[in-house]
Regions:
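All-alpha prenyltransferase/terpene-synthase fold signal
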Residues: 1-328
């Protein structure tokens, strides 16, 4: 069954719900809305609402919760762009470029608080147990994502980051919000602990596959489709799985080519391209295989839930496959 109409309708509903709490005027609200209105796949709220629908949750409450995780995601993007000094996000100037760093920090703070306002709206009328579980789940996500971002920044000054450290970092920085989205969908539908555990497993493995694919796109993607400069991860010194594997497997000459450009914001285009070529040769196939492995783990977790077929279930299944084949 074609689920595109289901997805399109959900995106419209989530967008309207998010904007309903960000209708204020002036630079603060304009800056806060900028990232939200700048595009995005809305994967996290789609996961949350689809899970809730499958398990019999209330659509209106799921929409508020879905809007909450997307607004929280936008908060992290605004602050990440400041820390990484990124000039573009989805092909448009970042918030701090347009409004300055102080206003961008405030806009991120506002989005953070608005995510809690939205989850409170989702939880009205729910049992105290459900309220506490949902708030604990969302709060844990903020803590874990912050820890992941701190690790990502720490890794920029290291050349000895291991694959295990990388997986731990992306589990926290990226995959945690996918896991939180799936889990919150179950919490709102009052699913049992076994289902909640499997939903988290689906989300965490999906998120890891998503981030590995994102790292690959940073090396192989089209600049116009990505909406940011290619090789920006190399320039910023990001320890992606491609960099980690190549530094471990490469010859002294290959390592030197990588390290000349890695984290060097004044690197020439030729130096960046040379480093990218080495990464492609040494680690691209490995990264693709690793992304597929985590995609398959995500599918296994979903299958273990024994959920009924339908557009929502098909969306969750296809998402686990499509995240490793995307072009942007």
């Amino acid at each position: 069954m074609n689920y595109q109409s289901y997805v399109d309708e959900l995106i419209k509903q989530v967008d309207a719900t998010m904007l309903s709490v960000l209708e204020g005027r002036g630079p603060l609200y304009e800056a806060a809305r900028h990232t939200l209105l700048g595009g995005g796949k809305r994967l996290r709220p789609l996961i949350l609402v689809a899970v809730s629908d499958i398990l019999g949750g209330e659509r209106e409450k799921a929409l508020y919760a879905g809007a909450s995780v997307e607004v929280l995601h936008s908060f992290t993007l605004v602050h990440d762009d400041i820390m990484d000094q990124d000039q573009l996000r989805r092909g448009k100037p970042t918030v701090h470029v347009l409004w300055g760093v102080p206003m961008a920090i405030l806009a991120g703070d506002l989005l953070h608080v608005k995510s809690y306002q939205l989850i409170q709206m989702a939880l009205r009328g729910k049992s105290s147990e459900t309220v506490l579980r949902a708030l604990d789940t969302l709060t844990r996500a903020v803590v874990v994502i912050s820890e992941g971002q701190a690790k990502d920044m720490e890794f920029e000054s290291r050349s000895d980051v291991t694959e295990a450290e990388y997986i731990d970092m992306i589990s926290k920085k990226t995959a945690e919000l996918f896991a939180t989205s799936a889990e919150l969908g179950g919490v709102l539908a009052e699913a049992d602990e076994d289902k909640l555990r499997k939903l988290r497993e689906y989300g965490i493995n999906l998120g890891i596959a998503f981030q590995i694919a994102d790292d690959i796109l940073g090396l192989t993607g089209d600049e116009k489709e990505l909406g940011k400069p290619v090789f920006s991860d190399i320039r910023e010194g990001k320890k992606t799985i491609l960099v980690i594997k190549a530094l471990h497997e490469g010859s002294e000459r290959q390592r030197k080519i990588i390290l000349t450009a890695l984290g060097n914001r004044s690197s020439s285009r030729d130096e960046l391209a040379a480093a990218a070529n080495v990464l492609r040769d040494l680690s691209l196939n490995y990264a693709l295989k690793l992304a597929e492995e985590y995609s398959n783990k995500s599918l296994s977790a979903l299958d273990s839930l024994n959920i009924a077929s339908g557009p929502q279930a098909q969306f969750l299944r296809d998402l686990a496959t499509l995240v490793v084949r995307r072009r942007k």
